């Protein structure tokens, strides 16, 4: 694996066959699939030059599985659902063979959250029963990194590919003279631009949507992105902010959003002794006012009357399907049934309904209603979800259904925030002052995106938002324009013959897409026959 340790003074930028922008799981999985195909091909193939541009110091993991997440952060899916074969088997073997090493590290560095997780899962750990475990996410990052290091070495030994890592932020993209030119802001003495025949955009989701009107630092503690610079450092900021508040009545934390990131923040606060000792209250506000439901693996009896009635019709419209799902789940919730454990049943009925929809209505559901369906049945594992239950049980945590209108600094100049929100058609000011505000409210839409790279690529006609405005429009070969490809969350919201997803974040889904992208890239780069990915 090569890097650029020297100052690039040449006018002509270094040129590559392929440039990956972003080095997270989507990039790693695509490169691993490419490596498998190249290494198993019986035919010699021209050596590829591949660049991987990453703004953070850690390559191959991305935010969820890397150092920007807390060591204690857990996967939201148990291992049986987290990965598909053959990757699942390889991961199991790795977990078992390296258990002594990673478990000792986790115990030493993971604090109270790690100690609780190890205690709660001791029997499964001792018996190497991995399938039902919600594993620490960093483990998958280490697993991916070790696979990448081995693949890079093998490709180099066979003279099949040279993978060059470049520590820089991609700032711009345009096409010229049959190549794409990527402008870079290097960290250190790296190149300020590269050229590539093909580009793979693997930068994850758009930036977090800010909730403060001003860019200036407020007097209160404001965390706009829980993973920037990292989960551990932001928990430390919360700890310090509460330490500075003398009055116990004012040691309050506001969390905006009730998604998986919000749940993770609550989990880490619950297991931080200093935060627990000092915090008076934690308020979570979101439109639903509901956290992801706890998976208990105890499916309740429920017949889904609206959905079953709809399935008796000849043809189904997307809006009618969404309405039936919403009504049935509302009925189930009124009966105090656990929606997490109804997921498999409603997913099966959804599959039946899909077969009764024409392509126009299928696309309508995927692009208009899909994310709303996902929000209705968001789920989380016991370990992570139980922490918020415990915070609620002791009176620390309260959930509020409403839309945040603004968060302002206190007029008195004291280091506290006030929150104004809309609920039940009226505007309210929350009575509690907040020492800290954590923004977990989701990502920017692409038409108002602040990412310089995405803005440049869209302005230069290389890509455009799809119907959801959360992903980029691509064809069956993952191309937003010829040779300008997209992988990862930005593929969500596409409806093509081969790519039909409204949400692309789970590891198995990304891996399946990476397999297809790798095959497409190699087919376009290599004139020789390659083993299928």
Swiss-Prot record:
GO terms for cellular component: plasma membrane. Its main location: membrane. It comes from the Bacteria. InterPro entries: FAD/NAD-bd_sf (IPR036188), HpyO/CreE_NAD-binding (IPR038732), L-asp_N-monooxygenase_NS-form (IPR052189). The chain crosses the membrane at residues 1-21, 135-155, 193-213, 472-492. It is found in: Cell membrane. Pfam families: NAD_binding_9. Keywords: Cell membrane, Membrane, Transmembrane, Transmembrane helix. It is a multi-pass membrane protein. This is Uncharacterized protein Rv3403c. It comes from Mycobacterium tuberculosis (strain ATCC 25618 / H37Rv).
